[in-house]
């Protein structure tokens, strides 16, 4: 399921756990559907490479071509990479959530926009923010995020 280096689209955005984000073409013979518009014409998918594995999610072409430069069109990519679709998903509030195992083996979930768990301890943000909008998404993808 590898993609040649010549066809990769890469953004040097960093995730919380030190991974990189990039868009890659959907491999031949694979069908992805958009989680918003249910379109099957998904031509790219998002790759998150944390330190401990590879996680993939789809990009909805209908949403992107309509000018919505956001990650709301993420579709789950079942069974791909470490953790599969459960490791990377869009939640009901349209925040991008990443699940991972903490040092003691408990699963912790945080929002990539705020960088905090929705039920963070005192001293951190206790609630996730509203959806940042397309300009914040673009800044996040290009590594120019301001918290």
From Swiss-Prot:
It comes from Molluscum contagiosum virus subtype 1. It is found in: Host nucleus. Keywords: Host nucleus. One of its GO terms (cellular component) is host cell nucleus. It comes from the Viruses. This is Protein MC014.
């Amino acid at each position: 399921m590898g993609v040649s280096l010549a066809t990769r689209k890469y953004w040097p955005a960093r995730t919380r756990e030190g991974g990189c984000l990039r868009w890659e073409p959907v491999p031949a013979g694979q069908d992805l559907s958009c989680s918003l518009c249910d379109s099957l014409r998904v031509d790219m998918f998002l790759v998150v490479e944390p330190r401990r594995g590879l996680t993939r999610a789809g990009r909805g072409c209908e949403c992107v071509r309509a000018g919505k430069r956001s990650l709301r069109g993420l579709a789950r990519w079942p069974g791909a990479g470490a953790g599969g679709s459960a490791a990377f998903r869009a939640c009901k509030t349209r925040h991008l959530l990443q699940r991972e195992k903490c040092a003691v083996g408990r699963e912790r979930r945080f929002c990539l926009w705020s960088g905090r768990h929705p039920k963070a301890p005192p001293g951190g943000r206790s609630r996730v923010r509203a959806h940042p909008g397309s300009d914040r998404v673009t800044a996040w993808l290009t590594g120019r995020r301001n918290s």
